[in-house]
């Protein structure tokens, strides 16, 4: 659970089952904790690797929005099954009467004087149930594993 005043974010990390040459998805739930409309925007450090739907929008008071994050098919296993990619959820109070189509980039601009809450989420990979763990491992900080999909 997040410490934001506007949104409760679940989960606080994005966990993708990993299989080579397959798109994988996970869900993110954004809950508006306020009595006002809240606009949100999802950003990532690697836009080419992920598809986020919706990547921005408006959440009505005390409502929840499901965001689907899809990782594009990977051609090789990441080193040590580690990801250094991150996501950031930005949220702001929206004026009454604003619709989802009226959510703009400027609403998330701190330079324009808007109060923007930001929450960073890490990406983790887990071996899928079809993944085999072998005895010729890669090691890192005492963990030994290698996944083949």
Curated annotation (Swiss-Prot):
Residues 6-126 form the MSP domain. The modification N-acetylmethionine is found at residue 1. The keyword Acetylation applies. GO terms for cellular component: endoplasmic reticulum membrane. The modification N-acetylserine is found at residue 2. The keyword Acetylation applies. SUPFAM superfamilies: PapD-like (SSF49354). It holds the Pfam family Motile_Sperm. InterPro entries: Ig-like_fold, MSP_dom, PapD-like_sf, VAP. Keywords: Acetylation. PANTHER family: VESICLE-ASSOCIATED MEMBRANE PROTEIN-ASSOCIATED PROTEIN, VESICLE-ASSOCIATED PROTEIN 1-1-RELATED. May play a role in vesicle trafficking. Belongs to the VAMP-associated protein (VAP) (TC 9.B.17) family. This is Vesicle-associated protein 3-1. It comes from Arabidopsis thaliana.
């Amino acid at each position: 659970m997040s410490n934001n005043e506007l949104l409760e974010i679940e989960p606080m990390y994005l966990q993708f089952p990993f299989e080579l040459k397959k798109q994988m998805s996970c869900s993110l739930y954004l809950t508006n904790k306020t009595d006002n409309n809240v606009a949100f925007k999802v950003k990532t450090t690697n836009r080419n690797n992920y598809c986020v739907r919706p990547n921005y929008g408006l959440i009505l008071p005390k409502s929840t929005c499901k965001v689907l994050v899809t990782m594009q098919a990977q051609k090789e296993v990441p080193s040590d099954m580690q990801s250094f990619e991150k996501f950031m959820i930005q949220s702001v109070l929206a004026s009454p009467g604003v619709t989802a189509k009226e959510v703009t980039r400027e609403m998330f601009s701190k330079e324009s004087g808007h109060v923007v809450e930001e929450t960073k989420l890490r990406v983790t990979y887990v071996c899928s149930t079809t993944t085999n763990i072998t005895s010729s491992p890669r090691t890192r900080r005492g963990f030994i594993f290698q996944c083949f999909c």
